[in-house]
Amino acid sequence: MASETEPRPLGTFECQLCALSAPYSYVGQKPPDTQAVVLLEESYIMKDPFSSDKARFLVLGSRCSVCSRLVCVGPDCSLFYSKRVCLPCVQENMSAFPQEIQQDVEKRKSTSKKHSNRP
């Protein structure tokens, strides 16, 4: 049974690429119960279920800055390069990213293919 001081979920975050689904308790850049934390993007946040420390939280995801899809922070769904960008938008705009980001995306694709080929 949840205590009265625990934040109640505002809704359910669902990644539009991988269908990750989790209850979120805050949306914004300044998570509750933190003093010096300001996130670089408006994020969907949940309290860390593995910690009793109220200041600990998990970032679930945010909106893609290009297409506004709701995407998780997982490496197969999005990357953060000054703003959150979903991987389909990264692919469409690959030349707009620095060489290091392009190489990272290529590595992610090859790693993802290796995992999907396993029985």
Curated annotation (Swiss-Prot):
Q: Pfam families from the entry?
A: C6_DPF
* Lineage start: Eukaryota, Metazoa, Chordata, Craniata, Vertebrata
**Record's InterPro entries?**
CDPF1 (IPR042426), CDPF1_dom (IPR018785)
What's the family? Answer: Belongs to the CDPF1 family.
What protein does this entry describe? Cysteine-rich DPF motif domain-containing protein 1
Question: What residue intervals traverse the membrane?
Answer: none
